[in-house]
Amino acid sequence: TDLNTLFDGAGKVAAGTMTADELAALEDTACPTCGSCSGMYTANSMNCLTETIGMSLPGSGTIPAVMSARLRLAKEAGERVMDLLKEDIKPSDIITEKAIENAMRTDMAIGCSTNTILHLTAIAHAAGHDIDLARLDAYGRKTPQICKLNPASSVFITDLNDVGGIPAVMKELAKGGMIIPIA
């Protein structure tokens, strides 16, 4: 059961067209595993954009919490953090203006939560970059939406993972000159 069905169920109980027991049955299947829900809500949106910025490893935005790949990625992330310390690479070296722009364009391409605009502008500000709404509007007008995930469709974050995740999205955006891949 996706969250939209659950939200609708709550309204149906209030309207008297569904029983509380029926709603409870929906609740029991809404988010059946650990991790976030499978829709493109704030948690998954920011996870994908954190990957785009470069503050998490490729694949981290879409690998489900219950997969072995997530455990392997966690180990790899720990190793990478130690390398970054040795290399004296700081978040300010990673969160560049171009990385923020890439994240904003990726946001538009995959239809992230509207909350991401608040988070991305705050991240940009903290990193010393000035991103205003006019610039965001320009990105939105020029960046194609290349996929729609739940709640905008019946496609879930796990489906995006199955077709290559954020690296695949970024590759498509780079083909169109929408982003510049950052090593």
Which functions belong to the PLM regions below?
Residues 1-183:
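Catalytic or ion-coupling anion/metal-binding cores of large enzyme and transporter domains
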